[in-house]
Amino acid sequence: FQAEDGIRDRSPSRGLGDVYKRQMPDRLTLIALKGIPLVKPGDDLIQLVANAITESGEQLMNGDILVVAQKIISKSENCLVNVTDIEPSDRARVLALEVDKDPRVVEMILSESRSIIRKKPGVLIVENKLGLIMANAGIDHSNVESEIPEQTLLLLPDDPDASAERLRSDIRSQFSVDVGIIINDSVGRPWRIGTMGLAIGISGLPAVTDLRGDRDLFGRELRVSEEAVGDELAAAASLLQGQGAEGKPIILVRGYQSSAPSQPATAALRAPNEDMFR
């Protein structure tokens, strides 16, 4: 992977010939690392990764990618809130009646959000503080170890891109290899049933590959194509991670290559002036 040098200009005014040629692999290998315990606040993720690599009989190589479930990042960074510590505002109380939710949970959703996009009983679709459109701001209480799980809320990391960069840097120091890191989370989609993995934090690989200026099979120039590489890899890894009690939060991806510079996951966010649905 090339060293990071910022986010490329994705505006149409950029020269269409200024593209990064892809080396499309014939094969991708995805391996669920074994032996990762339930993560607690303050746990050393590097040691957990080292133990899992050994137990899985693998060895990290330059160019590998680790896709890490958001939950273990959030737990290690202590992004936990007990609902008994939350005092709901008047706005949260009114909204809670509309959506049939605990007003304390609604207060937490509001505090983690920029705006409400849609609402109905049981769910609030919001733009959260990271700019992601998610149900309930990505707040969850599944797979949270607690005496009363329903009272413990797990928030998204404050800055998933920074979390990914720290983990990548620590792995480079520990293993002397340069890997890519994707932090993924499961999200729903407005016009499709079912959840899938989404990259909410990235370091060491592009979030989006700009294909404008490339040619199709018949030599026609691509004018608008941009590939969400981070999300595609996040979704593939999510198949192995599962959604419930599988206990496979870290997936090793081997075989993806790119000459494009690293981008944070925020590079994949659509600009407000390009949003046709809000």
Protein language model regions, located:
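Short, conserved clusters of charged catalytic residues that mark active-site
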Residues: 2, 11, 162, 166
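Short, small-residue-biased leader/transition segments that mark boundaries at the very start
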Residues: 3-20
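N-terminal and secondary-structure boundary signal
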Residues: 24-278
